[in-house]
Amino acid sequence: MSKVISFASDFGLNDGSVGVVKGVISRIDKSIKVNDISHGIPPQDIKYGSLLLMRAIQYIPQGVLLAVIDPGVGTDRKAIAITTDWGVMIGPDNGLLNLACATVGGAKQAFELENENWIIPHEGNTFHARDIFAPFAAGYASGQLKLEDFGKELNLEDLNQYLIPLTDVTDTEIKGEILYIDEFGN
């Protein structure tokens, strides 16, 4: 098992959220390397994050992807792990992981993260990256947690999807949407 977790979020770097998530990972296994993809994703912008992950997944080490852009935190949305030929992708069930999964050959299985032994007890319900996603990512990356112990297997068709909007082409115009602009304007 690869001891690399690639981590992307919309947390920014102005408070301690990224450091706390990395701290949870380190407390589970100090030898896990955390590769930061980006923490500058615009807040709650699932579309931007999904496209960023689609572009990045081809170049980051295989292993575990921990991606958290989660406007539905604190609701009944599921916390999930998706298996692919690339590795395991962990995050909220809001479509964030779909394009990255498709880029590496598609989802094979999905599991709900519900094993209480790997959920950090918490007062509030607003930091699932710390309390749920990071412990499962670290447990799996370290070999301490097997996929079948995550929780129940989910039907792939029941996962929330994010689809790229199509362009509308006529004889006189093309209508589309700019989906992603990097720091250099590309």
Language-model features: where?
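Anionic-ligand-binding alpha/beta catalytic cores of soluble enzymes and soluble regulatory domains
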Residues: 106, 111, 120-186
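Short acidic/glycine-rich loops and adjacent helix/strand connectors
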Residues: 7, 11, 30, 138
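A short, flexible N-terminal coil/short beta segment enriched in small residues
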Residues: 1-19
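Structural signal for hydrophobic packing residues in well-ordered secondary-structure cores
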Residues: 25, 29, 57, 61, ...
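Short acidic, Gly/Ser-rich segments with clustered Asp/Glu that frequently serve as metal-coordination loops
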Residues: 11-15, 72-74, 181-186
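Short, solvent-exposed amphipathic alpha-helices that sit
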Residues: 17-25, 182
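Active-site histidine-anchored catalytic micro-motif
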Residues: 4, 16, 28, 34, ...
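N-terminal active-site wall of soluble small-molecule enzyme domains
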Residues: 50-53
